[in-house]
């Protein structure tokens, strides 16, 4: 018991000492360095393929979780941006859903078939938000978000820069009060994203097996016939 008390005292003393240390002024410098790295990496960003897991978590009023897994594709050619999410499993059950954003139009199909696809032409104004963490430069982020640097964390063995983002557009921040992303800044890609949607709901996106600047499948941005 004495040993346990001694450990607690040492730990508490360490916390007090840390609290008394002057705050590091490096956060702003660290953020500037991260954004500069993203600016550099974004210039060389063309394509990304990644396996993903999207978890929708609800804590209120009734706890619930939905998990979707599949493959995501991103492509940036000059000012043109395309992305697609092909869902293969929904709550561990086989699925064939697909979401495709191209030429400013978002299309979705619950069956993955072209004939069942629905189009949303107003999605183009949110293009810069869809680029979040995949080819977006530091300038792109600063233009749309108020950014706070939260340090680094290991994600799947990779040292990731953690950023907290609050949208400058009130229409966005009303629906998504806060976004936290973990970035591999050397490649301008996200390893993890957490969207706080308020009212007890959040979405967590995990990305693995990330391949950058390699040819994409010919059907990456197409539905099945």
Task: Give the role of each language-model region.
Residues 14-16, 26:
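Cleavable N-terminal signal peptides
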Residues 30-33, 138-150, 205:
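A short, amphipathic edge element
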Residues 106-134:
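Acidic/charged, solvent-exposed loop-and-adjacent secondary-structure segments enriched in E/D, K/R, S/T
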Residues 31-109:
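N-terminal mature ectodomain segment of secretory-pathway/periplasmic proteins
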Residues 130, 135, 148-225:
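Gly/Pro-enriched, hydrophobic low-complexity segments
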